Amino acid sequence: MFSRGEGSLIGEVEKINKFLEFAQQSFTKHTNKLLPLEKNRDLISSFDECLLPIASHDINGFFNYLNKSALSLFKVTKDQVIGRSTTMTAPKSEQKQRNKLLNQVNSHGFIDNYKGVRVTSDGELFQIEDATIWNVIDKNSHKIGQAVIIYKSNKL
């Protein structure tokens, strides 16, 4: 039998596993491509170990997942970022452009070849040179969040 804390943790793992399953399916549906995930692992490990940064947020714009590469890129830990607003990743000067971009993703389902400036937790700016951002949809075709995979970035 699980203690209350362990049961909560298992529930969270199941919840993120389901979200990542929808993220993977949505990526393929929108882009006609596959995410570069290792096939011989469970889904969470495949996302976690992907060499490219992958992050997602829920329908309200709060981070619900970052893989190891994304945590490293943004210089954060999961405890520092999960449940926090994704606005923290863009400098104030880029917020208007960021909002415009997310609205385009809402309208079109995804955007390829995204470029934009982002900021790490210690204030260092970097340029995303190539990324895909897509809507994550559930089995009933309801939008449940958005996700990004970053193919290339450079320090500024």
For each of these PLM feature ranges, what is it?
Residues 1-58, 132-135, 142-156:
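PAS-family sensory modules
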Residues 46-156:
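Sensory/regulatory domains in signal-transduction proteins
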